[in-house]
Amino acid sequence: MSKAETIRSAKLGKKELRLVRMNGRYFGLADGVKCAEGENADDVWRQLHDDAGERFLTFFPNGFHSDGYASQERDYKLAAKVKLDDTATLEKAANGTGFGEAILAIFRATNMLSPFEKTRLQDVLRGPHADDFVQAAARFTLDVSNSHLLAMEQALKPHDNAKWTVATYLPYLWRPDTHMLRKPKATKDFSTRVGHRFASEYEARLSLPVYESLLDLAEKS
């Protein structure tokens, strides 16, 4: 099996479109899910873009100029990062205390987590493990190490919320240039289709090798 190669990419709404070449064929992916396949790169890209565009226009009939597009698909995430940087700077969060309510507001500011995860986070960030979790997340952002990931797991596990989306959310907002938000299903689907080892190495438990594999997938895609 040849190495998968991304030869073209674009954004359409919140969707990330990629044209990937592997084993002499071309695959059109929308957020890691295969939507088109063929032997001609231009045809596959056109089909992928047309299909994704039709779904996008279902929700935003006037395209990128539709009322509500910016607030729903872009601005609220940028606003969450600005608010995080203003209320809990990375350096202060790594060693400070009392950031629980501020961090809870950041989690509530986007739809990147499930309602169940957000509900459990309220117990985490208003309970005795709040400082432990925030400090561990900040330290993991600064230094991707097993000890910091384990510290996050220990703070989240009593509330049944040691999930990849929760653990990677703050690092992604603090340092989007070096960290990735892990959404297991989409990431596994994409890695399977492009032949990356992440699909076979993935496990639900927070594990440093899994996260390092994710970063490798992002770098090579």
What are these model-predicted stretches?
Residues S2-D160, P176-S221:
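An N-terminal alpha-helical hairpin/helix-loop-helix interaction module that forms a charged
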Residues A167-W174:
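Short, hydrophobic/amphipathic alpha-helical patches that form generic packing surfaces
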